[in-house]
C-alpha cells in the first residue's frame, strides 16, 4: 500500500485529486416543555438567557453547507453549558448560544460504530449486519458500499462530501468512506488509536488519506483541526457536507505534549494485547478535563476558519457526541454511561447553529436521536431518501423552520442484553438483570423511581412497541 507523507502546512488540499468531481415548537413553553435537563443543572452564563425554541418562519436561504461535528465518548454534562462544574468549553457554549441547544438529544446507540451506522444510514443499527457489531472490532463487517448514506444521497443532489477523522464503519479493502459516498476521506478506520503513533487496536498504523496510508506523527487532534480548517476555507463551487469526527476525548488518555505516556502505551501495544490502548491503568479527571477543553479549542479553530471563509451565514453547524461518556465523564444527574441504555449511555450534548434560518439563544426539549439528523439534513439539502431503504428517523426541518411540532413517537434502542424505548416523557428499560422498568423522565432523569408496578398497562404497551420494532431487525449472531 502506498505511503503518503505529511505536510504541516494547513493550506494543502485534503487530497491530491481535485475536489468537486464528481423547525419552533410553538412559542409557548407548554408546547416545548420546560427543558428538564437544563433545569437540573445550575444556571450558567450560557443558559440563563435561553428561550424555548421558536422557529423563525418566513425566512429563505440557499441550501446550507453542512458541518457535522462529533466528539467521541463525550458525556452529556461534559460541556459547561450542560452543567459541568469544572470543564470550561467556551467555544461550544458560544456555538449553542448562537443557535439552539437540545436537552433531550440521543445517540442512535450506546457505542461508537452503531451510532455512526444510524447517522450515516438514517436507520436503526440493527437494519444492517455491520450495525450489529457493538462496536466493530475486526475486518469481517462494515457499512455495505451499496447501502445509501447521508453522503451518497447528498452527493447525488449536488453536494461535495468529505469525512475527516474517525470512520469506524469497517476496514479496507471492503469498506471505506470513499466507497460509501464521501468524495474525500482523511482519518482513521478503527475505533481508537494512539494519538501520536497512530497505532490502532491491533497494532496497525491507522492514518489514511483516501485509501492510502498517510504519515504524520503529530498529535492527532491538531492534524484533524488543520485539515478541517483547510476544507471549510476552500473556494467551493457547490454546497458541501463535512463530517468532522474527532477521537477526543476517547481513550487512551493522552493530551498534546504527553509524549512519555504515549511512548509507554506504544510499548504495550507492540508487546501484544489490547491493554495498552485501552489504558485501563491511566487517565484522571484532570487529564480528561484537559482533553475535553482541547476538543473545545479545536472546534473553535475550525469555526474561526469557517468565519474567515465568509460562509458562516449559510453553513449549518451541528455538534454532538457519538454516545454517552466513559469512565471520567461527568454525567450528573443521569445514570449509566457508554454501552448502557440508561440515560447516561445514550443522551448526548447537541447544539445546532444556522444563522440564515435559526435564531440564537434558544433551547429545545424535543426528544430526538441520530437518525433524525439524517432525515433532516437530506431534506434541507434537497435530497430524497432511497425508498428501498426507508429511514427510521424523521425530518425536523418542519420543526426547525416552520414551527411544526412532531407527533409523539417512539425512540427505540437495542444493544446486547439491554432494551429501551422512549415515548414522550416515559421510558421503558430492561437492563442486564432482565427486569422490565418504567421511568418518567420529566420527574426522574436519574431513572431511580421505577413505575412499572404503578403503571402496568403503560409498561405493557411500551414493551409491546419495543418488541414490534425489534421483530423487524436483524437478530444478533449467536456468541461463539
What are these regions (language model features)?
Residues 2-5, 11-34, 41-436, 441-480:
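Formylglycine-dependent sulfatase
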Amino acid at each position: 500500500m502506498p505511503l503518503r507523507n505529511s505536510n504541516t502546512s494547513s493550506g494543502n488540499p485534503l487530497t491530491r485529486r481535485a475536489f468537486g468531481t464528481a423547525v419552533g415548537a410553538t412559542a409557548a413553553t407548554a408546547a416545548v416543555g420546560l427543558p428538564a435537563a437544563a433545569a437540573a443543572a445550575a444556571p450558567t452564563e450560557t443558559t440563563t438567557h435561553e428561550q424555548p425554541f421558536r422557529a423563525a418562519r418566513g425566512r429563505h436561504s440557499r441550501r446550507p453547507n453542512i458541518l457535522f461535528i462529533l466528539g467521541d465518548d463525550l458525556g452529556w454534562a461534559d460541556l459547561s453549558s450542560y452543567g459541568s462544574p469544572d470543564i470550561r468549553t467556551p467555544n461550544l457554549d458560544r456555538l449553542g448560544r448562537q443557535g439552539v441547544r437540545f436537552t433531550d438529544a440521543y445517540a442512535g446507540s450506546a457505542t461508537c460504530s452503531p451510532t455512526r451506522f444510524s447517522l450515516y444510514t438514517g436507520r436503526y443499527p440493527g437494519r444492517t449486519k455491520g450495525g450489529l457489531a457493538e462496536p466493530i472490532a475486526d475486518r469481517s463487517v462494515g457499512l455495505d458500499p451499496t447501502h445509501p448514506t447521508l453522503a451518497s444521497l447528498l452527493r447525488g443532489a449536488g453536494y461535495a462530501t468529505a469525512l475527516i477523522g474517525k470512520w469506524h464503519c469497517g476496514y479496507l479493502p471492503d469498506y471505506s468512506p470513499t466507497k460509501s459516498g464521501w468524495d474525500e476521506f482523511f482519518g482513521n478506520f478503527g475505533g481508537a488509536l494512539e494519538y501520536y503513533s497512530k497505532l490502532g487496536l491491533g497494532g496497525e498504523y491507522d492514518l489514511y488519506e483516501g485509501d492510502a496510508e498517510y504519515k504524520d506523527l503529530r498529535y492527532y487532534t491538531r492534524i484533524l483541526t488543520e485539515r478541517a480548517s483547510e476544507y471549510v476555507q476552500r473556494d467551493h463551487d457547490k454546497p458541501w457536507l463535512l463530517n468532522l469526527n474527532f477521537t477526543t476525548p476517547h481513550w487512551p488518555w493522552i493530551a498534546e505534549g504527553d509524549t512519555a505516556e504515549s511512548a509507554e502505551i506504544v510499548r504495550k501495544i507492540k508487546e501484544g494485547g489490547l491493554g495498552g490502548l485501552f489504558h485501563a491503568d491511566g487517565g484522571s479527571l484532570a487529564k480528561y478535563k484537559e482533553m475535553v477543553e482541547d476538543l473545545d479549542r479545536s472546534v473553535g479553530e475550525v469555526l474561526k476558519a469557517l468565519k474567515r471563509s465568509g460562509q458562516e451565514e449559510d453553513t449549518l453547524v451541528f455538534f454532538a457526541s457519538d454516545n454517552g461518556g466513559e469512565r471520567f465523564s461527568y454525567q450528573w444527574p443521569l445514570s449509566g454511561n457508554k454501552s448502557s441504555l440508561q440515560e447516561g449511555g445514550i443522551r448526548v450534548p447537541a447544539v445546532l447553529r444556522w444563522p440564515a434560518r435559526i435564531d440564537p439563544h434558544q433551547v429545545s426539549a424535543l426528544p430526538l436521536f441520530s437518525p433524525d439528523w439524517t432525515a433532516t439534513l437530506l431534506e434541507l439539502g434537497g435530497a430524497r431518501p432511497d425508498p428501498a431503504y426507508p429511514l427510521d428517523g424523521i425530518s425536523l426541518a418542519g420543526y426547525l423552520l416552520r414551527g411544526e411540532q412532531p407527533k409523539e413517537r417512539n425512540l427505540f434502542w437495542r444493544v446486547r442484553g439491554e432494551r429501551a424505548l422512549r415515548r414522550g416523557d416515559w421510558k421503558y428499560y430492561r437492563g442486564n438483570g432482565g427486569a422490565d422498568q418504567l421511568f418518567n423522565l420529566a420527574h426522574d432523569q436519574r431513572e431511580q423511581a421505577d413505575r412499572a408496578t404503578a403503571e402496568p398497562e403503560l409498561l405493557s404497551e411500551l414493551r409491546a412497541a419495543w418488541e414490534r420494532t425489534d421483530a423487524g431487525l436483524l437478530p444478533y449472531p449467536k456468541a461463539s
